[in-house]
């Protein structure tokens, strides 16, 4: 492990020197990439410095024990060694987590898709509630959310809403949100006071660059139509809305949020690229046999992942059995607890897999 940490320290020193190079500073894309790598490596280098300090102190305490005759000094050295041994174990666990290979998509921006599922109007209303939950979380994280397309429900909320979210490590934070979110509550339209169960599906797709997915424009059919508002009424007399169909996969994407046809086309193409990437990525994982039976799920949008119980003010994530008894706070965007617990569960799984591979 020390050899690996030394190699990381050497790379960190190289990057630290490179970002001060005027030639690199003039290349903003290269500079941003190196700056990001610097921040990632710095986390490991700082912990490694603490680890080396603990190892040095352990050696010093052992040396005291080997030469010291005074019983009091020997006792102090023994106590120090016991404390340092615990610190060493703790920091080694932190280092192992930091050395887990990151999902290459973690740093990417995302396309967030939310759709009302079973439950009719109530499902659309809940889809709107889920959207606002993520909206508030984005506000707190300082991320930018941009609407791509939305179809409003007849009684509020959304039958479907698609947006882009950009910021630091967006996919890494929100990738576990993909799946079916179930709600149990008394709908506003319910006169008997009965609790109904509805659902909304969430898909979190990494936003990919043009280099990541090469799309043949001959495989894409482009249709234009007038933007429409609630109830299908026309809100734009120009054909600015765009519908793209990827003929080989049958994937259809539309965007009508912008007044400009060009901007709608660019947004729709961005979503299409991410969806094609998801299809190809899952196919690749299947071929390599890496789709493991994970405790935290496969990220499939059909997995039932979480239940929001309004009468009991309870939110339960079924993948890890984690429950929060403060539903209003969760719906206000306080989902950090779930995100952190899911991240820890993923790290524990990957550490276990790493141990099995090296056994």
UniProtKB/Swiss-Prot annotation:
Organism of origin: Cytophaga hutchinsonii (strain ATCC 33406 / DSM 1761 / CIP 103989 / NBRC 15051 / NCIMB 9469 / D465)
Gene3D superfamilies referenced in this protein's UniProt entry, alphabetically: 3.30.160.20, 3.30.70.1660, 6.10.140.1950
Top-rank taxon, per record: Bacteria
Upper classification of the organism: Bacteria, Pseudomonadati, Bacteroidota, Cytophagia, Cytophagales
PTM sites of type N5-methylglutamine: 233
Similarity comment: family membership: Belongs to the prokaryotic/mitochondrial release factor family.
Location relative to the cell: Cytoplasm
Major subcellular location class: cytoplasm
GO MF annotation list: translation release factor activity, codon specific
Role: Peptide chain release factor 1 directs the termination of translation in response to the peptide chain termination codons UAG and UAA.
Signal peptide: none
Listed GO CC annotations: cytoplasm
Keyword entries, A-Z: Cytoplasm, Methylation, Protein biosynthesis
Protein name in UniProt: Peptide chain release factor 1
NCBIfam families for the chain: prfA, PRK00591.1
Keyword Chaperone among UniProt keywords: no
PTM section of the record: Methylated by PrmC. Methylation increases the termination efficiency of RF1.
HAMAP family registered for this protein in UniProt: Rel_fac_1
């Amino acid at each position: 492990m020390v050899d690996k940490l030394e190699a990381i320290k050497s790379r960190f020193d190289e990057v630290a020197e490179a970002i001060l190079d005027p030639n690199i500073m003039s290349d903003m894309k290269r500079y941003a990439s190196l700056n990001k790598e610097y921040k990632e490596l710095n986390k490991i280098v700082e912990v490694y410095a603490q680890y080396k300090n603990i190892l040095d102190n352990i050696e010093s305490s052992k040396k005291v024990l080997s030469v010291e005759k005074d019983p009091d000094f020997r006792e102090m050295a023994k106590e120090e060694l016991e404390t340092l041994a615990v610190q060493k174990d703790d920091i080694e666990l932190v280092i192992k987590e930091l050395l887990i290979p990151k999902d290459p998509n973690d740093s990417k921006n995302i396309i967030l898709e939310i759709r009302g599922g079973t439950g009719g109007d109530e499902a659309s209303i809940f889809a709107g509630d889920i959207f606002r939950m993520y909206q508030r979380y984005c506000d707190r994280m300082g991320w930018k959310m941009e609407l791509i397309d939305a179809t409003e429900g007849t009684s509020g909320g959304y039958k479907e809403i698609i947006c882009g979210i950009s910021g630091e490590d967006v996919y890494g934070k929100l990738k576990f949100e993909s799946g079916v979110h179930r709600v149990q509550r008394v709908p506003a339209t319910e006169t008997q006071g009965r609790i109904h169960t509805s659902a909304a599906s969430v898909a979190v797709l990494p936003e990919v660059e043009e280099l990541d997915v090469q799309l043949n424009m001959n495989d894409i059919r482009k249709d234009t139509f007038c933007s429409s508002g609630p109830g299908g009424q026309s809100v734009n007399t120009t054909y600015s809305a765009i519908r793209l169909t990827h003929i080989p996969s049958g994937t259809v994407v539309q965007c009508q949020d912008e007044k400009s046809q060009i901007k709608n086309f660019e947004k729709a193409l961005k979503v299409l690229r991410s969806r094609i990437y998801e299809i190809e990525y899952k196919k690749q994982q299947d071929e390599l046999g890496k789709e493991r039976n994970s405790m935290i799920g496969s990220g499939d949008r059909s997995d039932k992942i979480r239940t929001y119980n309004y009468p009991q003010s309870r939110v339960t994530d079924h993948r890890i059995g984690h429950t929060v008894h403060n539903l209003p706070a969760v719906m206000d965007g306080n989902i950090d607890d779930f995100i952190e617990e899911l991240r820890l569960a993923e790290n524990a799984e990957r550490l276990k897999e790493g141990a099995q591979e090296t056994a």
